[in-house]
């Protein structure tokens, strides 16, 4: 009985002294990359919004292994439209870099946005390659999810999506 009482006293002593021995730690303030003094901020944000719009529309592309020639052609036209829009963003960013060549912030941020556009363009080109192979009745292309034609498509679209999220969620644009 005496032993049990001693153990309880020791346990209670430990429980009550631990909070005073260890100093509490607080979460560190998060550091976000800052982009300061953007001279063409409105234009760059508009290009970022345009990329978001195009990306949302890209999700409507529906490629199936049983598309007939007309379906392949129509899907390719949709992709060509998205490529035109993305190349327009790319061109606007190149012009922006020329106009603001002396602004590090503008050069840096426009290159970040260009990375997203380039990733989406490569993904769409991969889809065009798949359509071409489907049109040629390539048996590997008809497997779709088990083929090597969709892997790079998903890789590049996901890469662009991750970069977009990184910019939107973690950049402090001042």
Where are these regions (language model features)?
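Long, charged/polar, soluble alpha-helical segments
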Residues: 69-76, 80-81, 85-91
């Amino acid at each position: 009985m005496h032993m049990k009482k001693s153990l309880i006293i020791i346990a209670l002593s430990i429980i009550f002294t631990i909070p005073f021995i260890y100093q509490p730690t607080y979460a560190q303030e998060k550091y976000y990359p800052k982009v300061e003094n953007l001279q063409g901020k409105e234009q760059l944000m508009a290009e970022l919004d345009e990329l978001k719009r195009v990306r949302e529309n890209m999700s409507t592309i529906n490629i199936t292994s049983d598309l007939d020639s007309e379906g392949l052609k129509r899907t390719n036209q949709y992709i060509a439209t998205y490529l035109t829009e993305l190349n327009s963003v790319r061109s606007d960013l190149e012009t922006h870099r020329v106009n603001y060549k002396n602004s590090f912030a503008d050069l840096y941020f426009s290159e970040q946005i260009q990375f997203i556009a380039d990733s989406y363009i490569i993904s769409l080109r991969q889809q065009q390659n798949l359509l071409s192979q489907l049109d040629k009745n390539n048996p590997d292309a008809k497997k779709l999810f088990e083929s090597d034609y969709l892997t790079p498509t998903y890789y590049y679209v996901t890469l662009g999506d991750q970069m977009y999220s990184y910019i939107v969620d973690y950049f402090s644009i001042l």
